[in-house]
């Protein structure tokens, strides 16, 4: 799976340990999601193209660089909303394209129900964000939708991933890079990542019952 990028960093591993803990409260969980995403984005943006520009400092004019391409962040509703704030810290000019998928608990398949993209979406690099990469079904459907809409460059950022989902995704879209902070043991009979961290959406929005 040459398109899979496993990000290894001491800070990420430390924060991920606390994130997994069932006793981590919702406020701290949200903060950790934000911080881990922030750190991962440095690696995911490593190959962004730059263009020449000039900047006037208080004492002189100098040649410099700035991003050459427009960015579109595509959070998969709802859990990925917890990752969105950290993206804006690094890419404040990015546009947002929302993708809505609802998991069917019986079939374990994701049902597409909503999309809202910026008008110039086909001109932008799309960074799809979703904290959990389990069966790979949602990721495949999201990338298929974006490609059908004319988006040419797509990256995927997910905090945790299962090997089953990564293998399935790579067979369909070997051209799309997936960045993850951990590849866990696998999936259980309900399609949840093991050992994982539970339902990320429920823990972000404090709807665990």
Swiss-Prot record:
Catalytic reaction list: UMP + diphosphate = 5-phospho-alpha-D-ribose 1-diphosphate + uracil
Binding, 5-phospho-alpha-D-ribose 1-diphosphate: 78, 103, 130-138, 199
The keyword Nucleotide-binding is annotated on this UniProt entry: yes
Pathway assigned in UniProt: Pyrimidine metabolism; UMP biosynthesis via salvage pathway; UMP from uracil: step 1/1
Gene Ontology BP annotations: UMP salvage; uracil salvage
Free-text cofactor note: Binds 1 Mg(2+) ion per subunit. The magnesium is bound as Mg-PRPP.
Listed EC numbers: 2.4.2.9
Entry superkingdom: Bacteria
Ways its activity is controlled: Allosterically activated by GTP.
Enzyme class (EC, first level): transferase
Molecular-function annotations in GO: GTP binding; magnesium ion binding; uracil phosphoribosyltransferase activity
Residues reported to bind uracil: 193, 198-200
InterPro entries xref list: PRibTrfase_dom, PRTase-like, Upp_B, UPRTase/APRTase, Ura_phspho_trans
Needed cofactors: Mg(2+)
Keywords: Allosteric enzyme, Glycosyltransferase, GTP-binding, Magnesium, Nucleotide-binding, Transferase
Family statement: Belongs to the UPRTase family.
Role description: Catalyzes the conversion of uracil and 5-phospho-alpha-D-ribose 1-diphosphate (PRPP) to UMP and diphosphate.
HAMAP family referenced in this protein's UniProt entry, alphabetically: Upp_B
Protein name as annotated: Uracil phosphoribosyltransferase
């Amino acid at each position: 799976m040459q398109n899979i990028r496993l990000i290894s960093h001491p800070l990420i591993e430390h924060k991920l340990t606390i994130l997994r803990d069932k006793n981590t409260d919702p406020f701290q969980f949200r903060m950790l999601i934000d911080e881990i995403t922030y750190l991962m984005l440095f690696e995911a943006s490593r190959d962004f193209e730059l263009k020449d520009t000039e900047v006037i400092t208080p004492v002189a004019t100098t040649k410099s660089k700035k991003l050459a391409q427009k960015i579109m962040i595509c959070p998969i509703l709802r859990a990925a909303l917890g990752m969105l704030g950290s993206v804006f810290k690094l890419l404040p000019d990015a546009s947002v394209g929302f993708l809505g998928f609802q998991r069917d608990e019986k079939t374990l398949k994701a049902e597409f129900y909503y999309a809202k993209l910026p008008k110039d979406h086909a001109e932008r690099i799309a960074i799809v964000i979703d904290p959990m990469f389990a069966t790979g079904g949602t990721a495949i459907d999201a990338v298929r939708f974006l490609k059908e809409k004319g988006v040419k460059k797509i990256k995927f950022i997910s905090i945790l991933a299962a090997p089953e989902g990564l293998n399935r995704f790579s067979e369909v879209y070997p051209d799309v890079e997936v960045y993850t902070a951990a590849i866990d043991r696998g999936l259980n009979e309900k399609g949840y990542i093991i050992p994982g961290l539970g339902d990320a959406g429920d823990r972000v929005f404090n709807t665990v019952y």
